[in-house]
């Protein structure tokens, strides 16, 4: 495994594949693991920017889970979703106060030309900062943390799915928080089922039923056992 930027042939092949890959796409995710595919090349070209430009031409929202320190690669995306360590490394803000986080997040968004940032804060939940509007701080959902593997991937996947359905970022962030709360209760990298997700979102919104019939109870218990 290497983490070098793409060679010219690799870059051109991936770039040429974008139009077909984006057919029927309602949202796009740049899940950057710092392995090289989304790195800026020596000539300044960058597949991340090409994806964002192609999506902009088609009206497709792009969300990025950032890595390393060159977040300018995500310029034009709708949102970046760093964790606390990634945010602190790039912004210089360790998150001691909400005011400090907001100031640092807004400055960072202006610098990288991205209108919003969803900060995942582990046991402290999430914080959504948008260029227009007040910050939104969301408490963590998990009562018991078993394994945090896959939580970040779950957050951006649910966030993108919600945006593809037309939800606001505030509502999408709450849905992502609910889903992440389900994931960290499971051992290993485990998915969230549709039933689990709907139950978590309804509970978060106060609409989860307190009285259920036997089939509903069986379905819920099956989710808990997974």
Language-model regions, residue ranges each:
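Conserved N-terminal subdomain of the carbohydrate kinase-like
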Residues: 1-30, 190-211
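Positively charged, low-complexity intrinsically disordered leader regions
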Residues: 209-225
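Conserved phosphate/ATP/ADP-binding segment of small-molecule kinases
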Residues: 33-135
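Active-site donor-nucleotide binding/catalytic segment of nucleotide-sugar enzymes
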Residues: 30-33, 226
